[in-house]
Amino acid sequence: MRRFLIERGLERKLIKLERKNKALYEQVKNKINEVLNILDMGHYKNLRHDLKEYKRVHIGSFVLIFKYNERNDFIYFTDFDHHDKIYK
C-alpha cells in the first residue's frame, strides 16, 4: 500500500460527511483504499489546465481529487465535492 496524506480541508469534509451521509462516506473510504492499492495509477484520469498535476476519480455524482508523486510513491488526497462545484 502506498503512503498517503489527506489534506486538512478534505479531512473536515469527510468528518462532516460521516455525520450527514454515512453511505457516501463509506463509498469515499472504499474508493480511497482502491486508489491506494491499485497497481496502475494511469487508470485514473489526469485533469487539465490549472489542475494538471491532479487526478480524479468519480464516486456517483461526486469527484475525489488527488495528486500522485511517482518518485516517492505518495498520494495527496486534496478535495471532494459534487462534480458541478469541484472545479470552480
Mark where each language-model region is.
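Alpha-helix N-cap/helix-start and coil->helix boundary motif
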Residues: E11, M41, H83-D84
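Enriched for short, Lys/Arg-rich terminal
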Residues: M1-F4, I15, R19-E26, I59-V63, ...
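A broad, structural micro-motif
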Residues: F4-L5, G42
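A short, surface-exposed loop/turn module that caps and links secondary-structure elements
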Residues: N33-R56
